[in-house]
Amino acid sequence: MARMIQCAKLGKEAEGLDFPPLPGELGKRIYENVSKEAWQGWLKQQTMLINENRLNMADPRARQYLMKQTEKYFFGEGADQASGYVPPTEG
């Protein structure tokens, strides 16, 4: 049976992650409070941030920026948006 959690991002009960996605305290906090669905949303957001900002993941400053954005996305006021991004419209 899947592990169910109260997702901090979605505000509903949902299936939890199978393991902490990141090392350290932030990874533990995400594991305990973020659903698989919300994590997938973050992976899309993270990809946009990396591409739009041309982040070099070998650069410690880029990794630090993404860690801050991860925390803001799940537990703060929301992560930065990729400049020029327009969400798709339905219809």
Swiss-Prot record:
GO molecular function: iron ion binding
GO terms under cellular component: cytosol
GO biological process: cellular response to oxidative stress
The keyword Iron is annotated on this UniProt entry: yes
Gene3D superfamilies reported for this sequence: Fe(II) trafficking protein YggX
Keywords: Iron
Family indicated by similarity: Belongs to the Fe(2+)-trafficking protein family.
HAMAP family in UniProt: Fe_traffic_YggX
Function: Could be a mediator in iron transactions between iron acquisition and iron-requiring processes, such as synthesis and/or repair of Fe-S clusters in biosynthetic enzymes.
Protein name, per record: Probable Fe(2+)-trafficking protein
Source taxonomy: Bacteria, Pseudomonadati, Pseudomonadota, Betaproteobacteria, Burkholderiales
